[in-house]
A protein has these predicted regions:
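Mechanotransmission and gating elements of multispan inner-membrane complexes involved in transport
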Residues: 190-336
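The feature marks short, hydrophobic/small-residue-biased sequence motifs that occur predominantly
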Residues: 97-167, 171-192, 252, 272
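A hydrophobic alpha-helix feature that marks transmembrane segments and, especially
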Residues: 34-40, 335-371, 379-384, 452, ...
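Hydrophobic, regular-secondary-structure patches
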Residues: 31, 35-113, 119-145
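Transmembrane alpha-helical interface segments in multi-pass membrane proteins
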Residues: 356-358, 364-410, 443
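C-terminal membrane-exit region of the final transmembrane helix in multipass inner-membrane proteins
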Residues: 436-475
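Short, strongly hydrophobic transmembrane alpha-helices
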Residues: 16-40
Length: 475
């Protein structure tokens, strides 16, 4: 009876109830969808880090990460490699030579970490070979008499290996992408012009386009104007095993693009055989072994086993290599719950205000109910149920809308191309696929019910304090 009465009371003032319900719906929808976008970005970041950058476990000399000394190689590397491969749970392992050096072109230079790899085993551990930008080459797949290097897009831009141009073919491509005629006319003034750097290109383009045009079409213009000459050259210089400076000219095998601009800027991959010739290291001298597991959940178990087997070496899991990723994955659920609690706390004030108005408007009615024998517990429960119903209707509607939108955007994703540089500078992808677990919806529903109950306490107590005789005299 109380449940039915409370439900009818919610709709006695439809306008007021709908205002509260709509505000709750918008709040829940915005909160849940924002959480889905953030969760999708973080899951993609972790997935990219494990598949393209660091894999699951690293093995190296205990002092190697302090200064990346070329002398700190893994002793008995063949035996260590065999031990790792024989450990249950290990899917693949690759060996690397790691040295620090400088990458130079005729106009620019940058500090880099040079990684000597075997392309075949590297493909088994990481998927960096799949990130090669079309038209720039490949991952050491084409035979060449030159020494080759596989570099990141950010480094290629810094060294002016990637340049920008605007000509008739670029303008035609932009027209095919349905850019407005007025934008094409503005860009036509640069027809036939080549830009030496991304900075100069952006400066010139910004000079002729409005802020709105830059925001809407900047990413497309940059993509079409992008220019690369196959097998461009750069020089790598570094110290050999005898601490003598050495170096060589490398041709660009390909350019990779991932969502981490810092990684792109600092990591240069070359063939191990080429690097060992230049450094004087032996064919079995490796600084690092990268391990890929069959199952991510077995990381701690496998690392513990390897630490026991390889006690003289440092064995680090991906959580130890990049603790910020570990923190995100471990704390993410708590953070999202706190985020939703803050939103619901703000919405609770609206519910409290509405229920206080309800009590004020129905003072005479509540006094009459008390006078004819309805006890205080029933009055309290009725007010509480009205608040819970308001919260649930708005909350469930918000959840349904957010679930629908998340499902529709999860397949195609949300493209933040206009903010790609900012996202990549922080190591996040600019194309995000929202995702959220079903358990989170359950958590939100429980929080909504709790919000309704807590929001009803003060108004319900106010109702209980009403004197029936005074309330009946209220007009």
């Amino acid at each position: 009876m109380i449940w039915k009465t409370a439900w009818k009371n919610v709709w006695r003032n439809k306008v007021r109830s709908l205002v509260v319900i709509i505000s709750i719906t918008i709040g829940i929808f915005g909160g849940v969808f924002a959480v889905a976008v953030m969760n999708g970005a973080i899951e993609q970041k972790v997935d990219a880090a494990l598949n393209e950058e660091i894999s699951h476990i690293h093995v190296n000399d205990p002092a190697f990460r302090d200064n990346y000394d070329i002398q700190l190689i893994i002793p008995n590397s063949d035996q260590v490699l065999s031990t790792i491969k024989g450990t249950p749970g290990v899917a693949a392992v690759c060996s690397r030579t790691v040295i620090t050096g400088m990458a130079n072109t005729a106009t620019k230079s940058a500090g880099v970490q040079i990684l000597g790899i075997d392309p075949g085993t590297e493909k088994e551990v990481l998927k960096l070979h799949e990130t090669c930008i079309p038209g720039t080459g490949d991952f050491f797949e084409t035979e060449s008499r030159y020494q080759l290097a596989y570099i990141g897009e950010a480094l290629a831009k810094e060294l002016n290996i990637i340049r920008y141009r605007i000509d008739e073919s670029v303008l035609d491509s932009l027209a095919a992408r349905e850019l407005p005629a007025e934008v094409l006319e503005k860009l036509a003034v640069f027809s036939g012009k080549r830009f030496k750097s991304e900075k100069s290109f952006k400066k010139e383009v910004k000079g002729v386009l409005t802020m709105k045009e830059q925001h809407e079409y900047g990413a497309a213009i940059k993509e079409e104007a992008w220019s690369f000459r196959a097998r461009s050259k750069m020089t790598l210089t570094f110290m050999d095993k005898d601490q003598m400076q050495t170096g060589a000219v490398f041709r660009i095998a390909g350019i990779y693009n991932i969502s981490n601009g810092m990684f792109e800027m600092g990591q240069v991959f070359v063939k191990n055989e080429d690097l060992m010739k230049l450094t004087g290291l032996a064919a079995t001298d490796y600084h690092q072994m990268i391990v890929r597991l069959r199952n991510l959940e077995s990381t701690e178990e496998v690392s513990t086993s390897l630490k026991e087997e390889l006690s003289e070496l440092e064995v680090m899991t991906w959580k130890e290599i990049q603790p910020q990723l570990a923190m995100m994955t471990d704390m993410i659920t708590k953070f999202y719950t706190i985020f939703m609690v803050i939103i619901l706390a703000a919405l609770a004030f609206g519910i409290v205000n509405t229920m206080l108005m309800v009590v004020l408007e129905r003072t005479k009615e509540l006094g009459m109910l008390t006078a004819i024998g309805m006890n205080k517990k029933r009055v309290f429960n009725m007010i509480m149920l009205e608040a819970v119903f308001l919260s649930l209707v708005g909350g469930v509607t918000g959840i349904i809308i957010s679930k629908t939108l998340i499902s529709s955007t999860a397949k195609k994703g949300i493209n933040f191309a206009s903010y790609a540089e900012g996202f990549e500078a922080m190591g996040y992808p600019s194309h995000i696929y929202p995702v959220i677990s079903t358990s989170f919806f359950v958590t939100v529903t429980v929080l909504i019910i709790i919000t309704g109950i807590l929001s009803s306490i003060y108004p319900a107590l106010k109702a209980l304090k009403l004197d029936p005789a005074e309330a009946l005299r209220t007009e």
